[in-house]
């Protein structure tokens, strides 16, 4: 019982460490949209997409090996040597990547027909990614040592300082997109030094090629699946830059910023449910337990999806510059994909519990191929609508495949019906019914939201008050 309470406590602290920095970055959104143009946002989205992709290439999923084999080390010395050996390899490997990109990157991006200058924007992104690698293994270490509070405080402090520095550079020094990128680079350097310092007593620097080969044999098969997932979710940004323009990319990125707020709902809820799923796996009543978890999870997701979609227009009208007001149109389309990705994450946990990790990778690779092909085919003709719907379609297909593969004996009609209800309400009150008076529009949508979530609670047999009470207790 005590162990269970400790697990819940640690999980909640980890979730806060991820959620609070995301909320802080969102706080800056209303300010930044008044000082940055859609083109500036397009540049930032492109660089962020590139950095996300580079992080997978930079680590080759070796951090997964570290998490799995840390406690299999024979003693504390072996644990310290594992961290030192892996850190030495990762730093040396990434220095080579940085040098190659500095030498050949400009030529490569010309082949992509990118509209973003390699110098200074892409260079800053590459350097930021390099210094960010210094935080990955230490973060994994502190999770293994079950010291969530310390790690969470570091993440929150980084989020606060990043927010302040970004606003100073953009608002007071008028650095526009460069201000955001400079703040990320500066903080990545500062926290690289901090992480090196705090891990000194847990590390013995060394290089053991034999062990590195064992690590790579374990981790490299995981890379295609990880890359495929990010290709599915971020390749649209790269292709929008190629086939459309930076202004469109900025509008799309702004819509995605609001839609991805749903991840805050899903991540917090999932982190609360995940340990219980693994703990209950194999029990006779697992299907019943999972169905109850799924219904609660779907309810939270649909509540967030509907709220973000309904009020997206009013949000941009109140909190963003006029140039970004049209972004609301794409929010509901993108949110479908975010919703499907979150549900997929839940069923992916079941597949992982079955020990079928290759299935997740195979589905992600399939989705990545479909996503790239459809975007290349449809973007030039249908623009941002194609980008939003292709991403959502692919993630929906991946989700359905995982649901089928999980092969759980549970009811599937209720979440489907709930999803269709939310889609219908969203279509009517975002695209069909528009009130010019913003106050009346907000009042109407609050009423619609309240009625709809009441209907969803009946369909899914969920008590929203119990969900809130459960999170408060945790």
Regions found by a protein language model. Name each.
Residues 29, 58-74, 144, 255, ...:
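Helix-loop junctions and terminal segments of transmembrane helices
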Residues 431-474:
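Membrane-proximal transmembrane or re-entrant/amphipathic helices at the cytosolic face
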Residues 40-58, 183, 236-238, 248-267, ...:
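Alpha-helical transmembrane segments of polytopic membrane transporters and translocases
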Residues 85-113, 168, 266-269, 290-341, ...:
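Alpha-helical transmembrane segments of multi-pass membrane transport and lipid-handling proteins
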Residues 1-3, 7, 177, 193-233, ...:
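Interhelical loop/hinge segments that connect adjacent transmembrane helices in multipass membrane
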Residues 1-26, 77-84, 88, 149, ...:
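N-terminal membrane topogenesis motif
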Residues 119, 123, 152-200, 256-259, ...:
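Hydrophobic alpha-helical transmembrane segments
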Residues 6-64, 94, 98-105, 128, ...:
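Signature of the first transmembrane helix
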């Amino acid at each position: 019982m005590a162990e269970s309470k400790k697990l819940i406590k640690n999980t909640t602290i980890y979730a806060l460490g991820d959620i609070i920095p995301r909320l802080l970055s969102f706080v800056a959104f209303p300010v930044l949209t008044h000082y940055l143009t859609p083109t500036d946002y397009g540049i930032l989205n492109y660089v962020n997409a590139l950095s996300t992709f580079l992080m997978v290439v930079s680590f080759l999923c070796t951090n997964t090996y570290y998490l799995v084999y840390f406690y299999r080390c024979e003693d504390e010395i072996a644990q310290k040597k594992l961290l030192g050996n892996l850190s030495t390899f990762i730093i040396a490997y990434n220095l080579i990547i940085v040098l190659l990109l500095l030498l050949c990157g400009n030529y490569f991006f010309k082949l992509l027909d990118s509209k973003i200058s390699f110098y200074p924007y892409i260079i800053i992104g590459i350097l930021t990614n390099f210094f960010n690698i210094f935080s990955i293994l230490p973060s994994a270490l502190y999770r293994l040592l079950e010291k969530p509070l310390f790690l969470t405080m570091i993440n929150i402090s980084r989020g606060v300082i990043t927010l302040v520095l970004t606003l100073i550079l953009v608002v007071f020094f008028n650095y526009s997109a460069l201000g955001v990128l400079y703040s990320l680079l500066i903080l990545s350097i500062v926290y690289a030094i901090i992480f090196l310092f705090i891990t000194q007593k847990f590390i013995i620097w060394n290089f053991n090629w034999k062990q590195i080969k064992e690590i790579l044999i374990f981790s490299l098969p995981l890379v295609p699946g990880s890359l495929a997932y990010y290709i599915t979710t971020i390749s649209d940004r790269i292709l929008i830059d190629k086939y459309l323009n930076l202004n469109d990319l900025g509008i799309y990125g702004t819509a995605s910023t609001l839609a991805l707020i749903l991840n805050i709902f899903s991540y917090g809820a999932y982190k609360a449910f995940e340990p219980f799923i693994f703990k209950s796996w194999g029990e006779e009543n697992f299907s019943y337990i999972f169905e109850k978890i799924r219904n609660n999870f779907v309810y939270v997701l649909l509540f967030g999806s509907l709220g973000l979609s309904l009020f997206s227009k009013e949000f941009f009208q109140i909190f963003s510059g006029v140039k970004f007001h049209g972004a609301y149109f794409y929010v509901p389309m993108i949110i479908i994909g975010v919703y499907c990705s979150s549900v997929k994450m839940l069923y992916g946990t079941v597949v992982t519990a079955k020990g079928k990790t290759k299935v997740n990778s195979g589905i992600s690779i399939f989705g990545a191929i479909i996503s790239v092909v459809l975007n290349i085919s449809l973007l030039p003709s249908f623009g941002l609508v194609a980008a939003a719907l292709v991403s959502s379609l692919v993630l929906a297909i991946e989700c359905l495949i995982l649901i089928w593969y999980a092969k759980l004996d549970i009811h599937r009609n209720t979440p489907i019906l709930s999803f269709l209800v939310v889609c219908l309400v969203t279509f009517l009150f975002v695209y069909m019914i528009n009130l010019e008076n913003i106050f009346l529009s907000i009042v109407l949508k609050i009423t619609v939201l309240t009625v709809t979530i009441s209907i969803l609670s009946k369909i899914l047999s969920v008590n929203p008050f119990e969900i809130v009470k459960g999170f408060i207790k945790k």
